[in-house]
């Protein structure tokens, strides 16, 4: 979210990846490993192709746009697993945001107890994220929340968990 600084959703990843490539390829005229991998994955032949790809990426709901978004998100997590420093910086921003958001929710909802169960959900966490990213997130949560949380991956849709919680 542009206002709150919330980082980590699929659109956010796509925009940040595009911005990093734009910064390096267009503004600095530098072919970093991220630029080379992005251009290859997106099948772009020139700087003009890259700039023109923006309209395909921002188109939102059409099938081609969704395919391109998935491709960039997959590339993001692949590069993270290969320790790409530019992607690592973005992942750190995402992790920090997620960990502080979860900590704030625990505090605001007045959850108490020795161990508070937290179920991670959302398509990025449950479908796209790499095991390395999830480990980094769990480690950040452990530090920020001082080990109070018992972190699990949501195996079902989040709404099913909410209904189950209400039923008791």
Predicted regions located by residue number:
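Glycine-rich phosphate-binding loop of actin/hexokinase-like ATP-binding domains
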Residues: 1-25, 29
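ATP-binding/phosphotransfer module of carbohydrate and carboxylate kinases, centering on a glycine-rich
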Residues: 18-168
